[in-house]
A protein has these predicted regions:
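Long, low-complexity segments enriched in small/aliphatic residues
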Residues: 200-261
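Residues forming the flavin
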Residues: 1-217, 261-267, 276-277, 281-294
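Intrinsic low-complexity, disordered N-terminal segments enriched in polar/charged/small residues
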Residues: 271-272
Length: 295
């Protein structure tokens, strides 16, 4: 993206960190097909986030929590906020007597249409989550990712057969239902920069009354990290210790991911300035990476 300036004249991209667990619960607590979404708690009203709970087959429940990385308090631990979420009586009552069988986490691209980069470059096309086709209000992106992949495949065939330029991919995308869906959802995420209450009110007006067709588009004014405040200006957060029944620590959670890698695998994160973590992020922000990292 940087090399080919694919983000030129686009809003800064927005990100979130998402957590997901699969539970096998008691039959009397299971309602196959039930879908639940929540917003807010345990986060404060200035922090963007919400949950999903899907009752699947075989007495399984998929539950997760997504937190926007534009939060202000560097002491916040997204993983621990997710664990705390499960202690709410409405959620705990579903999980009690059950067993956690899987855990996972991943970064999400939340910027939507305003931050969508140019989707073509010499010899390559951007599709799915690499481009940022997630529908953030619905926390769904598999369907849009697959459709963008199908459009990319059509473009490649046209390019090889008829020597049509790869730029036709973006034209196809803008004529598809994916673009229409992302356009309708474009104002939801940026509206929550005003806080939870105003964000919900605006989203209700935008999505329910106007069906995402308001005659203006809200902007993402800056990158996520710009909102982070110095550690000394924000209150520390005291998270309860895990009970290993409903809530768990990171170590036992990572064990359930099933991931593996070679011991000598090269480190994929490269520091431009090795002094920066100590002299800047640790000193000013109490090194938030030790908390936002999900493993």
């Amino acid at each position: 993206i940087k090399k080919f300036e694919l983000d030129k004249d686009k809003d800064p991209q927005q990100y979130g960190i998402g957590f997901k667990e699969i539970w096998e619960i008691k039959e009397e607590n299971h309602q196959e097909g039930l879908v639940m979404h929540t917003a807010g708690w345990p986060l404060d009203t200035k922090t963007y986030g919400g949950s999903f709970i899907y009752h699947a087959e075989n007495k399984q429940v998929f539950l997760g929590y997504v937190i926007g990385l534009d939060y202000q308090n560097p002491h916040l631990s997204p993983f621990d906020e997710f664990q705390k979420f499960k202690t709410h009586s409405a959620i705990k009552s579903i999980l009690e007597g059950g067993k956690r069988i899987s855990y996972g986490a991943r970064a999400l691209i939340e910027g939507g249409l305003q931050s969508l980069p140019r989707m073509y470059m010499p010899g390559a096309l951007l599709i799915g989550c690499d481009a940022g086709t997630l529908n953030m209000p619905k926390i769904k992106g598999s369907h849009t990712a697959m459709k963008s992949g199908m459009l990319a495949a059509e473009t490649i065939v046209d390019h090889l057969k008829e020597k049509i330029e790869l730029s036709i991919y973006e034209d196809k995308f803008k004529k598809s239902w994916v673009y229409k869906e992302l356009y309708a959802a474009r104002n939801v995420k940026p509206s929550f920069s005003w806080g939870l209450i105003l964000g919900i009110i605006f989203t209700g007006i935008d999505q329910i009354l106007f069906r995402g067709k308001l005659p203006f588009t809200l902007k993402h004014k800056h990158a996520d990290h710009k909102t982070l405040k110095p550690a000394k200006e924000m209150p520390k957060i005291d998270y309860p210790k895990p009970d290993n029944i409903i809530t768990f620590d990171k170590t036992s959670s990572v064990y359930l991911t099933g991931t593996n890698h070679a011991d000598n695998q090269p480190v994929h994160l490269k520091l431009k300035d090795k002094d920066l973590p100590i002299n800047y992020t640790l000193e000013k922000f109490d090194e938030p990476a030790q908390r936002y990292c999900p493993v």
